């Protein structure tokens, strides 16, 4: 799928901050490299399940981000649908920043294995705040 120009921007901030309600994600970019920031929900993908954002760093590594309340199953479905429609490159990361506590257990471990095996994607889940560095 081609991402419309109106849905993306290029940023070179040291910290690219994404926030919705109580969940926030910081993409650390200390060398101020160009990062393509895509608003997925409501722009790049209009209908069906979709994550909130996609960041593509200067090495073409994709970072799919879902800022979520408590519904982790829905967050996983949103990331899967977005990767299927927009994913092009590997390595790839998928992030869920949730207000749910705790983010442990067999369901979480199984989801991480599923993403690695089926999507060649490293799934990272955090509570309320997540920070990730440019590769």
Language-model features: locations:
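Conserved catalytic cores of phosphodiester-cleaving nucleases, focusing on short active-site segments
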Residues: 53-55, 61-69
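Generic beta-strand structural signal
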Residues: 63, 92-93, 121
